[in-house]
């Protein structure tokens, strides 16, 4: 205080002011500080001081020929004095204005191509909508965000090779352009930038912006996609936010969003198949997102999301070392623990075997809408500091932390039995059982947890069991903070292993991820996702399964045909017929399968004769495990369009319609492809197959009763006559042969006689 008073007195004297403002600075230390090194020590001051001078800019001498000495207003544009210490001219800022207005022009055709990212940004801002400004406390948390909209996802090395190839094609040095995206981009850019006069270094810099994802660790409240991050300074301050809707989307955000949706769908589907890991890999390899192979995107895209990371782990890629529980990303910041199996009793006296973490640990928990810091000891929550967007989000974080703490009062708060199952109908592990239970209803958990009086700490308040805030009391160990908890900033990736049930572990054996952690949120992808794998046919519903199954048979007819006659069991077990089974009423699956397999066997018994259309139509039904029964069917039911629809065993129906004239098949009105061969070539083999051991006597004869189906013929006694339904719904009269010797010739005569009987 004394010093300040003294200074004030000194400053009131004019002599002091004069000394401070007029005398030269001649202290060596100060001169050294401001003049040593190339680095400007006070750029703002230097700029102000320079711009106050008449000629603050230096230029090449050639400028004197290119710019007049004075402008139209008679102001001097350059000085005849040389710049001290260089061979350059001193120039006025007015010269820049003159140059911009009257200087030489050049072709601008390449500007939008080189400065593409800037032009696109201007367009997005032009069409964006800025809403009202709201003043409120901003809970910002630092997240790793993409700051560069509109980029491809090349690695720095890949991009470097592309840039060298495009900008400096004649430079020496090995460049290996291997990936598809590298080659496409190089070709495209070389064409675009032919005869480009813009400085190569600038082109290289701009190309880098276009090719490489740049991320920064920034405080964000709200949208994290790159089109929001580019206006971060306009949309959120310390105590205000401005609503904003981007005026356009960029492919990199769309890729990230679509990748997450595809990965979630694939993990969910893989979980319910017989071998989840193999299925997941098969689907990742056969899926395209926006026309690019999903596996290529996974290799390049740094998005961290549970399903995406499971897919990456399956491909043997490294992922982040943090682990996921209850939709929150946990990162241990200090402490350590050992794991031990322990049996505990729930409030319902059910025994659970849990892996207890023994030891003191601290974690950060980061979710979409809430974040927290958790300190815990063995089966005890010491402290939880949570912040979130709203009451609901905060409650979610508290439940997850309470379950994670493994405290006894949490386990005792369970009412009723725990029997949650996953999509494949397998019981969840005990920790997820507890989590699901309390996510459904946490009332008892909060009531039993206990409350404590709290001290008044800046920025922290208490929260009561009914999730209302309080300044006096709070749930034991739990506080709500105004400040968010930053996401884990490191981009370090670790080697992980994955088991066939898609559980991902680090090298110490800790589970980082499992399918239970994959969000059930459904979204609509921005880019087209093409799942070529039959396992994903059902994603678009029953109709898609039906159409896809028949399309697959027709596409692969050549191989299917050979397998049908030589190795039917292998054909029936093909995974492409799996989705179809879900359309067949459960009770009928086995019976239909038995019936169709018998029918096929009868067709096979006679060489070289079968009915293509009928085999295609009935084949998917033969895939279910068959039941041996004598049941006959003239139509088979499939559940589509919300009800059972019939496929006729003989003849067309709205579900399966084969047009003989065009040789095209329509399934539920959708084109399913064309048959390349003539289905009649071995006149409908069903007939000849059936009629082995029978004589055809002629057309239908009503005296012999209603037409029997193929299988019922076997019940006839030798010499007995009957009407029989053959082929596409025609009826003929047959008699069972009295002896078996001439069976072989039957099929040939049958074919001729059927033609006569029908015509």
From Swiss-Prot:
Main location: virion
UniProt site (Avian adaptation): 627
Top-level taxonomic group: Viruses
Coiled-coil regions listed in the entry: none
Subunit details: Influenza RNA polymerase is composed of three subunits: PB1, PB2 and PA. Interacts (via N-terminus) with PB1 (via C-terminus). Interacts with nucleoprotein NP (via N-terminus).
UniProt-recorded name of the protein: Polymerase basic protein 2
Gene Ontology terms describing biological process: 7-methylguanosine mRNA capping; cap snatching; DNA-templated transcription; symbiont-mediated suppression of host gene expression; symbiont-mediated suppression of host mRNA transcription via inhibition of RNA polymerase II activity; viral RNA genome replication
Subcellular location: Virion; Host nucleus
One Pfam family recorded for the sequence: Flu_PB2_6th
One cellular-component annotation, GO: host cell nucleus
This protein's UniProt keywords: Cap snatching, Eukaryotic host gene expression shutoff by virus, Eukaryotic host transcription shutoff by virus, Host gene expression shutoff by virus, Host nucleus, Host-virus interaction, Inhibition of host RNA polymerase II by virus, mRNA capping, mRNA processing, Viral transcription, Virion
Short sequence motif named Nuclear localization signal, residue ranges: 736-739
Protein species of origin: Influenza A virus (strain A/Duck/Hokkaido/8/1980 H3N8)
Family: Belongs to the influenza viruses PB2 family.
GO molecular function: RNA binding; RNA-directed RNA polymerase activity
SUPFAM superfamilies, per database record: PB2 C-terminal domain-like
InterPro entries for the chain: Flu_PB2_2nd, Flu_PB2_6th, Flu_PB2_C, Flu_PB2_CAP-bd, Flu_PB2_middle, Flu_PB2_N, INV_PB2, PB2_helical
Function, as annotated: Plays an essential role in transcription initiation and cap-stealing mechanism, in which cellular capped pre-mRNAs are used to generate primers for viral transcription. Recognizes and binds the 7-methylguanosine-containing cap of the target pre-RNA which is subsequently cleaved after 10-13 nucleotides by the viral protein PA. Plays a role in the initiation of the viral genome replication and modulates the activity of the ribonucleoprotein (RNP) complex.
């Amino acid at each position: 205080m004394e010093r300040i008073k003294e200074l004030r007195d000194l400053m009131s004297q004019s002599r002091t002011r004069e000394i401070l403002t007029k005398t030269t600075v001649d202290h060596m230390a100060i001169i050294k500080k401001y003049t040593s090194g190339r680095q400007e020590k006070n750029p703002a001051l230097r700029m102000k001081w320079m711009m106050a001078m008449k000629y603050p800019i230096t230029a090449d001498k050639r400028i004197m020929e290119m710019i007049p000495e004075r402008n139209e207003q008679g102001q001097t544009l350059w000085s005849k004095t040389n710049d001290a210490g260089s061979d350059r001219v001193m120039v006025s800022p007015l010269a820049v204005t003159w140059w911009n207005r009257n200087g030489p022009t050049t072709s601008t055709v390449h500007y939008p191509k080189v400065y593409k990212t800037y032009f696109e940004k201007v367009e997005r801002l032009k069409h964006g909508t800025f809403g009202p400004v709201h003043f409120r406390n901003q809970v910002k948390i630092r997240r790793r965000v993409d700051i560069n909209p509109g980029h491809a996802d090349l690695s720095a090395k890949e991009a470097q090779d592309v840039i060298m190839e495009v900008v400096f094609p004649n430079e020496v040095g090995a460049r290996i352009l291997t990936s598809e995206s590298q080659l496409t981009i190089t070709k495209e850019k070389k064409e675009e930038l032919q005869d480009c006069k813009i400085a190569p270094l600038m082109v290289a810099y701009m190309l880098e912006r276009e090719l490489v994802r740049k991320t920064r660790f920034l405080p964000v409240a709200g949208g994290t996609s790159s089109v929001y991050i580019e206006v971060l300074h306009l949309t959120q301050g310390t105590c205000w936010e401005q609503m904003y809707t981007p005026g356009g989307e960029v492919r990199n955000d769309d890729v990230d969003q679509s990748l997450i949706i595809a990965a979630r769908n694939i993990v969910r589907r893989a979980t319910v198949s017989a071998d989840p890991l193999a299925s997941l890999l098969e689907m990742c390899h056969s899926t395209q997102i926006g026309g690019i192979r999903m596996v290529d995107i996974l290799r390049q895209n740094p998005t961290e999301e549970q399903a995406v990371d499971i897919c990456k782990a399956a491909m043997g890629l490294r992922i982040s070392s943090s682990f996921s529980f209850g939709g929150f990303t946990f990162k241990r910041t200090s402490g350590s623990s050992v794991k031990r199996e322990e049996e505990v009793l729930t409030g319902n006296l059910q025994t659970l075997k849990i892996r207890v973490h023994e030891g003191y640990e601290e974690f950060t928990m980061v979710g979409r809408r809430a974040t927290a810091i958790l300190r815990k000891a063995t089966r005890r929550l010491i402290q939880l500091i949570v912040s979130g967007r709203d009451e609901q989000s905060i409650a979610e974080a508290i439940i997850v932390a309470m379950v994670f703490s493994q405290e006894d009062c949490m386990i005792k708060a369970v009412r009723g039995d725990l029997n949650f199952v996953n999509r494949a109908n397998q019981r969840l592990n005990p920790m997820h059982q507890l989590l699901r239970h309390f996510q459904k209803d946490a009332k008892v958990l909060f009531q039993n947890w206990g409350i404590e009086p709290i001290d008044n700490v800046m920025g922290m308040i208490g929260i009561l069991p009914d999730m209302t805030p309080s300044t006096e009391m709070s749930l034991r160990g739990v506080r709500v903070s105004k400040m968010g908890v930053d996401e884990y900033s490191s981009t370090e990736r670790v080697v992980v292993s994955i088991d066939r049930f898609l559980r991902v572990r680090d090298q110490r054996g800790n589970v980082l991820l499992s399918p239970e952690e994959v969000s059930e949120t459904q979204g609509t992808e921005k880019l087209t996702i093409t799942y070529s794998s039959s396992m994903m046919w059902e994603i678009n519903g029953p109709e898609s399964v039906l159409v896809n199954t028949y399309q697959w048979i027709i596409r692969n007819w050549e191989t299917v045909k050979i397998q049908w006659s030589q190795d039917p069991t292998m054909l029936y077990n093909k995974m492409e017929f799996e989705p179809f089974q879900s359309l067949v009423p459960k009770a009928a699956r086995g019976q239909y399968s038995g019936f169709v397999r018998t029918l096929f066997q009868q067709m096979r018994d006679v060489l070289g004769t079968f009915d293509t259309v009928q085999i295609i139509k009935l084949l998917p039904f033969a895939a279910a495990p068959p039941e041996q029964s004598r049941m006959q069917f003239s139509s088979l039911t499939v559940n589509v369009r919300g009800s059972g629809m019939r496929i006729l065993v003989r003849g067309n129906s709205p579900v399966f319609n084969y047009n003989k004239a065009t040789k095209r098949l329509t399934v539920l009105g959708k084109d399913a492809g064309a048959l390349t061969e003539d289905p009649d070539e071995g006149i409908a083999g069903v007939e000849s197959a059936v009629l082995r051991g029978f004589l055809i006597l002629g057309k239908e004869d009503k005296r012999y009763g209603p037409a029997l189906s193929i299988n019922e013929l076997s019940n006839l006694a030798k010499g007995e006559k009957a009407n029989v339904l053959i082929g596409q719904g025609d009826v003929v009269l047959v008699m069972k042969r009295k002896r078996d010797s001439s069976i072989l010739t039957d099929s040939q005569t049958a074919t001729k006689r059927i033609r006569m009987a029908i015509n």
